[in-house]
């Protein structure tokens, strides 16, 4: 079963242009059976699904609850908690990485760095926390090894880390636009129905594979050097 494990929907991420229903339809057309909603520091996109769509449409498609968390010191971290576990603290950006990992694990969840070899401040290996505490990578449950919006060298670096530290590698599109949806995915040997199913598969380190194709129309590709200013703005925002 293929799942896009890095999805931003309009109902939850202010920088996404894709409503969750369009996301689902596009994924279905590509033969992908599920998605992990990972909006920035909010579960609002998933709440929209749960409150207005779930059980009424797309009953053969799996929508899972996740989040892309903005840490104080280590960039963006993908988090999955068991269904039924409500963690409003995860919607308050800015926890330091070590505290975040302990909090997630204490409550039965898993976490891993998004695009770990990507942009400065946003990606774990390009932060001061990695330089000061590289051993923290051992505490991750997985590493995102394919992100459709990252360049090949970034994903290759992530794959190297996953192999070096014995972590499962996940994949996702990181889509904010419709034409990027489904360009990255994680493939599991069994069907995933719930967040707990996903957590178990990753913890068991089964035959999980990541893959996809590269998306070359990202905002950072278009705006060039101005992207560095935006990245610094993200860092400053998380310091607030």
Segments and roles (model prediction):
Residues 40, 114-117, 175:
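Short, well-ordered beta-to-alpha junction loops that form the rim of enzyme active sites
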Residues 1-5, 9-13, 17-26, 46-53, ...:
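Charged catalytic cores and adjacent phosphate/nucleic-acid-binding surfaces used
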